């Protein structure tokens, strides 16, 4: 591997166990991290604003809940597990002014630091600890004595605590050392994560799925078949990719499918590459971040419009019917 990788045997769990951790936010990621840390014998408190709907849940699960300001003042390590677009207003008001030299503030995504939404005071460490998966998977894998890959990065050193040692120890406490903890930078994590979401995992995949579905519908094929071929079977391919890689996927599909994939890739390849380069450029030059923060400042008009319109599409209407048996089994 090009990146340095660390495992449980390389990391001292005692580093994070000796410190008081405060987690700001108690969504799926905050909850999973708090539970994993506690099960790893780490002292954890939760910071939430007054009136938060998560207060009762956190208390029910046995955590001490403080206001954000109080949490910052009483913690050695503060993890900001809030949505990216809220970092500036929350951290500037309730976190940054109360940080002291020697403390460490951590993030699960490099967005707000890389795009200068927050400025970390001198002497305060700034670390990234990013599990490569959602909170639900982070918790599930930990309970199975397994873990997710984690990324760590150091943006700024602490005047008191070794930031890298703290980041590694924190990742180990969440189960990351069981799988592997890779060291990168805020810039690389942020830009590659945004690119993956936009060009492949969310934007790219959704675009291909919806365009494929609509192409078959316009050609007169039944909605059910269009959904099966363009949406439903994505999971089968994704699972093969996840566990066996591209070559393994090729080995598990028919010659017809493999040859068809090669032929289809030829006309699509150049177009996709050019589009992806444009997407990456807008991420790198800050244009996407600017657009996203403007969207937030206007109360998400485009997101709200898109979400409402999506419910009325044929792909969602037939999908709801065909997914019903699977949801019922759960």
From Swiss-Prot:
GO terms under biological process: isoleucine biosynthetic process; L-valine biosynthetic process
Pfam family, any one: KARI_C
The protein's required cofactors: Mg(2+)
Keyword Transport attributed: no
Transmembrane listed as a keyword: no
Entry EC no(s): 1.1.1.86
Residues covered by the KARI N-terminal Rossmann domain: 3-184
Reaction it catalyzes: (2R)-2,3-dihydroxy-3-methylbutanoate + NADP(+) = (2S)-2-acetolactate + NADPH + H(+); (2R,3R)-2,3-dihydroxy-3-methylpentanoate + NADP(+) = (S)-2-ethyl-2-hydroxy-3-oxobutanoate + NADPH + H(+)
Catalytic site: 109
Binding site residues for Mg(2+) 2: 193, 229, 233
Cofactor, free-text remark: Binds 2 magnesium ions per subunit.
Binding-site residues, substrate: 254
Pathway: Amino-acid biosynthesis; L-isoleucine biosynthesis; L-isoleucine from 2-oxobutanoate: step 2/4; Amino-acid biosynthesis; L-valine biosynthesis; L-valine from pyruvate: step 2/4
GO cellular component: cytosol
Keywords of this entry: Amino-acid biosynthesis, Branched-chain amino acid biosynthesis, Magnesium, Metal-binding, NADP, Oxidoreductase
Amino-acid positions noted as binding Mg(2+) 1 in the UniProt annotation, renumbered to this chain: 193, 197
Domain KARI C-terminal knotted: 185-329
Function: Involved in the biosynthesis of branched-chain amino acids (BCAA). Catalyzes an alkyl-migration followed by a ketol-acid reduction of (S)-2-acetolactate (S2AL) to yield (R)-2,3-dihydroxy-isovalerate. In the isomerase reaction, S2AL is rearranged via a Mg-dependent methyl migration to produce 3-hydroxy-3-methyl-2-ketobutyrate (HMKB). In the reductase reaction, this 2-ketoacid undergoes a metal-dependent reduction by NADPH to yield (R)-2,3-dihydroxy-isovalerate.
Family to which the UniProt record says this protein belongs: Belongs to the ketol-acid reductoisomerase family.
Name of the protein in its database record: Ketol-acid reductoisomerase (NADP(+))
Taxonomic lineage from the root: Bacteria, Pseudomonadati, Campylobacterota, Epsilonproteobacteria, Campylobacterales
């Amino acid at each position: 591997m090009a990146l340095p990788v660390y495992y449980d045997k390389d990391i001292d769990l005692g580093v994070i166990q000796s410190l008081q951790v405060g987690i700001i936010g108690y969504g799926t990621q905050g909850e999973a991290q708090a539970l994993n840390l506690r099960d790893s014998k780490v002292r954890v408190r939760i910071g939430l604003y007054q009136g938060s709907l998560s207060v009762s849940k956190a208390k029910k699960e046995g955590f001490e809940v403080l206001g954000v300001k109080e949490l910052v003042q009483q913690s050695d390590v503060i993890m900001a597990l809030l949505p990216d677009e809220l970092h500036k207003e929350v951290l500037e008001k309730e976190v940054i002014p109360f940080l002291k030299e020697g403390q460490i503030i951590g993030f699960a995504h490099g967005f707000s630091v890389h795009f200068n939404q927050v400025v970390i005071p001198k002497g305060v460490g700034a670390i990234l600890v990013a599990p490569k998966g959602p909170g639900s998977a982070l918790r599930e894998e930990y309970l199975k004595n397994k873990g997710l890959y984690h990324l760590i990065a150091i943006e700024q050193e602490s005047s008191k605590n070794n930031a890298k040692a703290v980041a590694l120890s924190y990742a180990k406490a969440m189960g990351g050392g069981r799988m592997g903890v890779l060291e990168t930078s805020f810039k690389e994590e942020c830009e590659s994560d945004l690119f993956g979401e936009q060009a492949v995992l969310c934007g790219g995949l959704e675009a291909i799925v919806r365009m494929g579905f609509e192409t078959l519908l316009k050609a007169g094929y039944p909605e059910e078949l269009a959904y099966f071929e363009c949406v439903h079977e994505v999971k089968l391919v994704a699972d093969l990719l996840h566990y066996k890689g591209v070559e393994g996927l090729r080995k598990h599909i028919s010659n017809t499918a493999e040859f068809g994939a090669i032929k289809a890739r030829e006309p699509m390849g150049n177009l996709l590459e050019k589009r992806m380069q444009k997407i990456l450029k807008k991420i790198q030059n800050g244009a996407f971040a600017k657009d996203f923060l403007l969207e937030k400042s206007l109360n998400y008009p485009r997101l709200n419009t898109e979400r409402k319109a999506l419910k009325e599409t044929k792909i969602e209407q037939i999908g709801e019917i065909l997914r019903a048996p699977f949801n019922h089994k759960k």
